[in-house]
Amino acid sequence: MSDVIDSLPFALTKAQIRVLQEIDQDMESIKSMNRLLQGDVGSGKTAVAIVAAYKAVKSGYQVAIMVPTAILANQHYQNFKKMLDRFSIKCELLVSGTAKKEKEKKLEELKTGKIDVIIGTHALLQENIEFNKLGLVVTDEQHRFGVRQRGIINSKGENPDILVMSATPIPRTLALILYGDLDISIRSEERRVG
């Protein structure tokens, strides 16, 4: 993971490094990761997700990033592509507005493993979406998706690692009640800009 961390245009905070260490341990474990990452908007959750995606792809897996809106999907696509292109990691975008011919091509490339990271909206939940080897599912703004929807995307892989991210502050006790099956990481310091 140090390759991608060193290529980031900013230094990671201590909290980001701690969260990445937790995620790294989870991804190395026999048990699939099931982690909630909570942090304010701008706290660097996307950078953490990019590093986790890099690790998954370099370990031979595909990554699905599911977000609630096409605008956010496009934003993530630009960020992931910018950071991962230099490592020959192919990132693609799939939203409901994707042209039919382009969508068919992406679905085929996803199925054959030519796409490493797919970023999309609810479009990723469609029945005809198949992965070659899905190993990591990241759901951003997880509260905007139901349990069933998250279950659909998770079932497209064979026990993939799961990372759900939220900017909505969730008191730890409530988080344990609502997401008792998840390990919880809270980004508790602001990312330095510049």
Where are these regions (language model features)?
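P-loop (Walker A) phosphate-binding loop of NTP-binding proteins
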Residues: 40, 68, 167
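Walker B catalytic acidic pair
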Residues: 121-122, 140-141
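Glycine-centered short loops/turns at secondary-structure junctions
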Residues: 60-61, 88, 113, 194
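Pre-Walker A segment
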Residues: 1-64
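Conserved helix-turn-beta segment of the N-terminal RecA-like "Helicase ATP-binding" lobe
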Residues: 72-109
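Post-DEXD/H (motif II) to motif III coupling segment of the RecA-like Helicase ATP-binding lobe
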Residues: 131-136, 142-192
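Conserved motor-coupling elements within RecA-like helicase/translocase cores
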Residues: 97-118, 128-134
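Post-Walker A helix-loop "phosphate-sensing" segment adjacent to the P-loop in P-loop NTPases
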Residues: 56-64, 85-86, 160, 183-186
